[in-house]
Curated annotation (Swiss-Prot):
Cross-link (Tryptophyl-tyrosyl-methioninium (Tyr-Met) (with W-95)): 223-249
SUPFAM superfamilies to which the protein is assigned, alphabetical: Heme-dependent peroxidases (SSF48113)
Catalytic function, reaction form: H2O2 + AH2 = A + 2 H2O; 2 H2O2 = O2 + 2 H2O
Protein name: Catalase-peroxidase
Length: 735
C-alpha cells in the first residue's frame, strides 16, 4: 500500500512540519536555549494587550465562590462524587497544583495553571484530576477571562474546605495561565514513571541523598510514595522522606503535620481494582477520549469502582466534615498492614468501634474500617511528628489555625510578595515567608536628586566595577519562578546575603558603608519628608557606573532608574529561607562555587531563565559585564578588552577574532587560553561561559550582531535595557 501524497509539497511523506530527526537527536548535549524563549505571545490566545490582573479586579469573587460551593454537591453521573461531595477531589487537585513547588529553584507550584498541560496533567500522582478540572469547566466557562485556571483550581480547593466546615486563612488571586508546557523545570532524569531508587538515572545517591532541586521521591509523584520509600511500608523511614520533601517545599515539621492531618481529614483514596484495568494517561489517550485519561475498564470505572492511587479507603468517619477525626483515629487504634484490592500496601485500624467505622462512599449500607497510608503513620511513629500531632489533637483550635496557615502558604508560596495578591480575601497579616518589605511612606527623590546623587556616588572613589557588581549582586537574586529575591529591601546588607562568597563580603562591606554615608548625608539635608533608601542607592550606583563606563568609551547612554525601593530589616528576613537564593554559580560574574555535574554554560542559561532573560539579553549582559570588569574576584577571564571599565563591544570583537586560537588549560576543560594564531603570544584567558558565545551557533549569531563595526550604539542601548530589566525585576508595584 503506497503512502498518499502530501497536499502541500505533492511528495510522498510520513512526516509534516516539525517531524523528523531533531537537532537534539543528533546532538543531545547541545545547549538548550529554548528555555529562554518560552510562553511566547504566539502561543497565548489572549493577545498581547490582555491584562489578567485588571480582568480579575472586575470579577465577582463571591459569585464564583457561590457557584463553586454549589458544584461541590452537584454529583455528575459521568464521575459521581464520593458521599455526594467533590470536596476531597477538589482539595487534592489544588494541593497537587501547588505541591510541585520546590524552594531550591522556585520552580513548580500553582502560579501558572501548569497542571492542565504536560507533563503534570499525566503524572501518575495526578491520576483522575483531569475529572476535577472537567467538573470545574462550567464555572470557568461562565466567568471566562476574569479568572484563570490557575486561580480557579486554588479557589476551588478553598471552597471545598469552606463547604465542609473549615475556615480558611484567605485567598489571593493573580495567577496567570500559561499556554504551553514548561520546558525549564527539571523533574528528574528517570526514563520511566515511578522508577524506584535502584533503577538507572536515579535521583538518589549515597545514603538516600535526593538530587537538588528535586522535592519528590519518584518521577511522577508530588512528594512521597504513600506506600513508603520505594514502596517499602516502613513508617519511620517514610517519615524521613516526608520531612525531606516537605522541607524542600519550605515547610517545617509543624506545617507538615498540619498539612497532612488537615488534608487527610477529607475524602478518600481509590484502589478498587488492579492497575491493568486503567487506560493511558491524558497525553497518551486516544483522540476520541478528548483529553480524558485513565479510563478504567474495572466494572463501572467510576464511583465505588474507581482506581486512582491504588490505595483504597478513607482515613476517618465523616470524610466531608472538618473535625478532629483524623488525629483521633490515628492515635486511638493499632494498625495492621494489608494489601488494597489494587495490591498496594496500606494499613487498616484494628478492632474498630462502630462510631469510627466509615460509611461507604457510594453504598450507605456498607461500612469500612479507617485506613492509613505508610506516610500517614509517620505522624505517629516519627518522634518529632508524633509530639506535634498529639499536641494538635489536644488543641483543636491550634490545629485548625496551623492547617489554615499552612494551606495558605502551600497555595500561595510561589506568588511572591503580598503586593501581587489580588481580591477581597487577601489576609491583612504580613507573613515572614512573603519576604516583606516596608511600604514607601516618604517622598521619593526626583530627577534632579537622581542626577545629583549620581555625581555624589561617582565622587566617592568607588570604582565602576565595585558599583556594578554590588548593584548586580543585589538585584540578580531575583527568580521569576517564585518571584523572590531582587534589589527591593536591600537585603544584600543583611544576613545571609552579606556573607555569601559570591558577593565578596569584604568589598561589599566597603561599598555599602560608602553608600550608607551618601544616604545619611542626603537624608539629613532634607527639610521635608524626602528620603532615599539604601536599596535605591545601590541600584542607582550601578546605573551611574554604567553611564560613566559609556562616557569612558566616548559614548553616552541613559540608564533608566525608578525610585521607590525600601529597606527591609533583619527581623523581616527569614535567614534560612533566603539561603536557597545564594547563587552557586553566576556566569554573569564568571563565578562558580564548586564543580557540578552540569556545565558552566548550562548553569548560566538556568540563571538567565530565572532572571526572565532572553538569549539576546543574556548575551549583551555578558558582553557588558565583562568589559565593566565585574568578574568575581576581579578575575581576568573573559575580559577581552584593553580598556576595562569602558562600556564597549570589545568582548564580542575579540571573541570573534580569528587571529586568536583557543586551547583548554585545565583537565576539566573549564579554563582556556587564547593565543595569537601566528606568534603564540598569550592574549586572553576565558571560562566555558565566555567561550560558549563563540562556540554555540545560536549564541554566536547573536554575538556577531554586537561585534559589528556599526553595533556600538545598539550594544549600549540593549545593555542598558537588559540591565534595567534585571534592576526592576522585583518592582511588582509598578506593574
Amino acid at each position: 500500500m503506497s503512502d498518499s501524497k502530501c497536499p502541500v509539497t505533492g511528495k510522498s511523506s510520513r512526516q509534516v512540519a516539525g517531524g523528523g530527526t531533531s537537532n537534539r537527536d543528533w546532538w543531545p548535549n547541545q545547549l538548550n536555549l529554548q528555555i529562554l524563549h518560552q510562553q511566547s505571545t504566539k502561543s497565548n490566545p489572549m493577545g498581547e494587550g490582555f491584562n489578567y490582573r485588571q480582568e480579575f479586579t472586575m470579577l465577582d469573587l463571591a459569585a464564583v465562590k457561590k457557584d463553586l460551593v454549589a458544584l461541590m454537591t452537584d454529583s455528575q453521573d459521568w464521575w459521581p462524587a464520593d458521599w455526594g461531595h467533590y470536596g476531597g477531589l477538589m482539595i487534592r487537585m489544588a494541593w497537587h497544583s501547588a505541591g510541585t513547588y520546590r524552594m531550591g529553584d522556585g520552580r513548580g507550584g500553582a502560579g501558572s495553571g501548569s497542571q492542565r498541560l504536560a507533563p503534570l496533567n499525566s503524572w501518575p500522582d495526578n491520576v483522575n484530576l483531569d475529572k476535577a478540572r472537567r467538573l470545574l469547566w462550567p464555572v470557568k466557562q461562565k466567568y471566562g477571562r476574569k479568572i484563570s485556571w490557575a486561580d480557579l483550581m486554588i479557589l476551588a480547593g478553598n471552597c471545598a474546605l469552606e463547604s465542609m466546615g473549615f475556615k480558611t486563612f484567605g485567598f489571593g488571586g493573580g495567577r496567570e495561565d500559561i499556554w504551553e508546557p514548561q520546558e525549564d523545570v527539571y523533574w528528574g532524569g528517570e526514563k520511566e514513571w515511578l522508577a524506584t531508587s535502584d533503577k538507572p538515572y536515579s535521583r538518589y545517591s549515597g545514603e538516600r541523598d535526593l538530587d537538588n532541586p528535586l522535592a519528590a521521591v519518584q518521577m511522577g509523584l508530588i512528594y512521597i510514595n504513600p506506600e513508603g520509600p520505594d514502596g517499602n511500608p516502613d513508617p519511620v523511614a517514610s517519615g524521613r522522606d516526608v520531612r525531606e520533601t516537605f522541607a524542600r517545599m519550605a515547610m517545617n515539621d509543624e506545617e507538615t503535620v498540619a498539612l497532612v492531618a488537615g488534608g487527610h481529614t477529607f475524602g478518600k483514596c481509590h484502589g478498587a481494582g488492579t492497575a491493568d484495568h486503567v487506560g493511558p494517561e491524558p497525553e497518551a489517550a486516544p483522540l476520541e477520549a478528548q483529553g480524558l485519561g485513565w479510563i478504567s475498564s474495572y466494572k463501572s470505572g467510576k464511583g465505588g469502582d474507581t482506581i486512582s492511587s491504588g490505595i483504597e479507603g478513607a482515613w476517618k468517619p465523616n470524610p466531608t466534615t472538618w473535625d478532629m477525626g483524623y488525629l483521633k483515629v490515628l492515635f486511638k487504634y493499632e494498625w495492621e498492614l494489608v494489601k488494597s484490592p489494587a495490591g498496594a500496601h496500606q494499613w487498616l485500624a484494628k478492632d474498630v468501634a462502630d462510631e469510627d467505622m466509615v460509611v461507604d462512599a457510594h453504598d450507605p449500607a456498607k461500612k469500612r474500617r479507617p485506613m492509613m497510608t505508610t506516610a500517614d503513620l509517620s505522624l505517629r511513629f516519627d518522634p518529632a511528628y508524633e509530639k506535634i500531632a498529639r499536641r494538635y489533637l489536644a488543641n483543636p483550635d491550634e490545629f485548625a489555625d496551623a492547617f489554615a496557615r499552612a494551606w495558605f502558604k502551600l497555595t500561595h508560596r510561589d506568588m511572591g510578595p503580598r503586593s501581587r495578591y489580588l481580591g477581597p480575601e487577601v489576609p491583612a497579616e504580613e507573613l515572614i515567608w512573603q519576604d516583606p518589605v516596608p511600604a514607601a511612606t516618604h517622598e521619593l527623590i526626583n530627577n534632579s536628586d537622581v542626577a545629583d546623587l549620581k555625581v555624589t556616588i561617582l565622587a566617592t572613589g568607588l570604582s565602576i566595577s565595585q558599583l556594578v557588581t554590588t548593584a548586580w549582586a543585589s538585584a540578580s537574586t531575583f527568580r521569576g519562578s517564585d518571584k523572590r529575591g531582587g534589589a527591593n529591601g536591600a537585603r544584600i546588607r543583611l544576613a545571609p546575603q552579606k556573607d555569601w562568597e559570591v558577593n565578596q563580603p569584604g568589598q561589599l562591606a566597603k561599598v555599602l558603608e560608602t553608600l550608607a554615608a551618601v544616604q545619611q548625608e542626603f537624608n539629613a539635608a532634607q527639610s521635608g519628608n524626602k528620603r532615599v533608601s539604601l536599596a535605591d542607592l545601590i541600584v542607582l550606583g550601578g546605573c551611574a557606573a554604567v553611564e560613566q563606563a559609556a562616557r569612558n568609551a566616548g559614548q553616552t547612554v541613559a540608564v533608566p532608574f525608578t525610585p521607590g525601593r525600601t529597606d527591609a530589616s533583619q527581623e523581616q528576613t527569614d535567614t534560612a529561607s533566603f539561603e536557597v537564593l545564594e547563587p552557586k554559580a553566576d556566569g554573569f560574574r564568571n563565578y562558580q562555587k564548586e564543580k557540578y555535574a552540569v556545565s558552566a554554560e548550562e548553569l548560566l542559561v538556568d540563571r538567565a531563565q530565572l532572571l526572565t532573560l532572553t538569549a539576546p539579553e543574556m548575551t549583551v549582559l555578558i558582553g557588558g559585564m565583562r568589559v565593566l570588569n565585574a568578574n568575581f574576584g576581579n578575575a581576568r577571564h573573559g575580559v577581552f578588552t584593553k580598556r576595562p571599565e569602558a562600556l564597549t563591544n570589545d568582548f564580542f570583537v575579540n571573541l570573534l577574532d580569528m587571529a586568536t586560537i583557543w586551547k583548554a588549560t585545565s583537565e576539566d576543560q573549564d579554563l582556556f587560553e587564547g593565543r595569537d594564531r601566528t606568534s603564540g603570544e598569550l592574549k586572553w584567558t576565558a571560562t566555558r561561559v565566555d567561550l560558549i558565545f563563540g562556540s554555540n551557533s545560536q549564541l554566536r549569531a547573536i554575538a556577531e550582531v554586537y561585534g559589528c563595526e556599526d553595533s556600538q550604539e545598539k550594544f549600549l542601548q540593549d545593555f542598558a535595557a537588559a540591565w534595567d530589566k534585571v534592576m526592576q525585576a522585583d518592582r511588582f508595584e509598578l506593574v
